[in-house]
């Protein structure tokens, strides 16, 4: 289970939590412009926009979980188990395997207008990366500074939803997630008035009672509502430090602690990492479950005209600044 969100001050920010019971050895990976992507059904992409994001690298190929390109378009793939369906290769379409979808989009789209044009021609297939690495059941959020969409490949076709919340979690499908927000239309960051009855002098006995009823569990529908409420009512300054800090606070509203979500006997889902991309400046920030310090990798401090992948391992050891 994972959560993704967008945020905008004077710059545009995008990120996600990756919630799972184990890591695949994730790294921050920069794919420079002249790295050659070998797509299974649509040939090679030898020159493209530079990309930075979190990935598992297999056979010198970046399997991105979330990423942004040098133009400010960002996207992430999140679990969509039970609903994701990837058809066979379809004639007349640009057939892209699900593991290729992120580089296919980010490699050639400079804005959401170009993303929409690309999506109109695409068929996302279930072609596996390798025999022992089948296609993951995913759906995607794609965004720039102006808008966001959710992309879901299901048995009844490819769905492309406008995403006015700039938020995505897992199941149910996105249109149902949006409908369920109707349950929370009465919530507010302000203190509520007594509308129960004029006959009862009911009072607010605590701050924060305007959001009474906001779900606090870890289910995907509840996380969707909680992070949407947090993000859409969020207030911060627009400096880099304030914006990045606020973004981590937004996703912090849905992070998972060890022991609270058991997935098997003695195994628990945790927030392995949280990312925050400044898509305007090309800076990838992250924290991990075991290291709360914010770490940054700036794509523009690398040679983006190169042809080889650039790797940075996640810094996992807790870093504590001692004041005395």
Predicted features, each with a name:
Residues 92-128, 240-248:
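Proteins synthesized as precursors that undergo proteolytic processing into mature forms
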Residues 135-159:
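Long, compositionally biased
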